[in-house]
Amino acid sequence: MAMPNLGDMMKQIQQAGEKMQDVQKQLEKIVAHGEAGGGMVKVSVSGKQKLLSLTIDPDIMDDAEMVQDLVLAAVNNALDESARLAQEEISKVTGGMMNPADILKNLNLGQ
């Protein structure tokens, strides 16, 4: 049984590191959107799972409980979309050689 070539292993590790840097750059470019209540609450989040914007229809501001529920729903919708887009981007960058869920966890972005 042949031993793995150390030079080849080091090259693969370097390539994986470069791909991770590419993934980080691509995640910064992703913007996902979510909404709830038929568009009464809209949010945008980055591919790094950061809230970028929140818009609330002023007509619903009198009902605090409804606003809270709609904000939570819209944020969760946007985060789900962001995770889906991030996994797609990771698959593109890595050519499917690395598990997108594992990469997201390594970047502290996975569930």
From Swiss-Prot:
The keyword Protein biosynthesis appears for this protein: no
Pfam families linked to this entry: YbaB_DNA_bd (PF02575)
Keywords (A to Z) from UniProt: Cytoplasm, DNA-binding
Molecular function (Gene Ontology), one example: DNA binding
A cellular-component GO term for this protein: cytosol
Main location: cytoplasm
Subcellular location: Cytoplasm, Nucleoid
Classification via InterPro entries: YbaB-like_sf, YbaB/EbfC
Source species, domain of life: Bacteria
SUPFAM superfamilies noted in UniProt: YbaB-like
Family in the record: Belongs to the YbaB/EbfC family.
Subunit field text: Homodimer.
Functional summary from the UniProt entry: Binds to DNA and alters its conformation. May be involved in regulation of gene expression, nucleoid organization and DNA protection.
Name of the protein: Nucleoid-associated protein Ppha_1174
Organism the protein comes from: Pelodictyon phaeoclathratiforme (strain DSM 5477 / BU-1)
Lineage: Bacteria, Pseudomonadati, Chlorobiota, Chlorobiia, Chlorobiales
